[in-house]
Amino acid sequence: MAIKPAYVKKTGTLLMERYPDAFGADFEHNKDVVEELTNIESKGVRNRIAGYVTRKMNNPVEA
């Protein structure tokens, strides 16, 4: 598994802090939320951020 770029982590973390109730464990839902809350035009970047947020929502505790 690859390490996510800093801009994906930074944007994802910022969105989760500002809108904690907007995200869930479903990738498709998170993808739509990221599209609504940001001005990111790139589909690939949007999906990477949504995937990062989904992964964090499914596994909130880090060891």
From Swiss-Prot:
Disulfide bonds: none annotated. GO terms for biological process: translation. GO terms for molecular function: structural constituent of ribosome. Pfam families: Ribosomal_S17e. One of its GO terms (cellular component) is ribonucleoprotein complex. InterPro entries: Ribosomal_eS17, Ribosomal_eS17_CS, Ribosomal_eS17_sf. Keywords: Ribonucleoprotein, Ribosomal protein. PANTHER family: 40S RIBOSOMAL PROTEIN S17 (PTHR10732:SF0). Belongs to the eukaryotic ribosomal protein eS17 family. This is Small ribosomal subunit protein eS17. It comes from Haloarcula marismortui (strain ATCC 43049 / DSM 3752 / JCM 8966 / VKM B-1809) (Halobacterium marismortui).
